[in-house]
Amino acid sequence: MHPDGCFDWNDQAAMRACVDQVGFAHIFVPTLDTPMVVHAPLVIAGDAFHFHVARRNRARPFLDGARVLASVVAGDAYVSPDWYDRRTDQVPTWDYVAVEIEGTARLLDEAALLAQIDRLSDVHEATLDPKPRWTRGKVSASSIKGMLAAIEAYEIGDVTMRGTRKLSQNKSAADRAGVASHIASPLLAQMIRAL
């Protein structure tokens, strides 16, 4: 995470809410030859985090039992020094909000995979209201069986979470106001204004 302590984010509940809202991670997996990255939906399951991958994913053979690092980015955007109140001797930067989840990956059974699919659907279909929500009941049993044959579910347990909220906290209130009024990400602008 960012080495400057003013950007540390230690609110575990807020980080979990962020992960739940984003619902997608880049999961870094060590191998003997080279690190690999799994791009996967992520859901909270108690103190752990669940994800699934295609059985054909080249990182899959290395997942079970591996110490992995999942990176969840809630937003990021370029910051121009022209937006600061004090423009002299300023350089461009990047603001972002990110959560790292470090833990041990463990293969889950089919029941956990089905529960994960249902949870993912429940969370993300709710954001699409007023459309009728998709549920697994809308798909034939044979289609579900085929899908299950193509993917595997994993849990990241024994978790350590770290967060960074780099939202121009190291700048003056006037500089932050300038960034918030110009930054391309409405979410980051809202977070900067809330500081």
What does each model-found stretch correspond to?
Residues 106-195:
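C-terminal edge-of-domain segments
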Residues 41, 52, 71, 104, ...:
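Residue-level recognition of well-ordered beta-strand positions that form the cores
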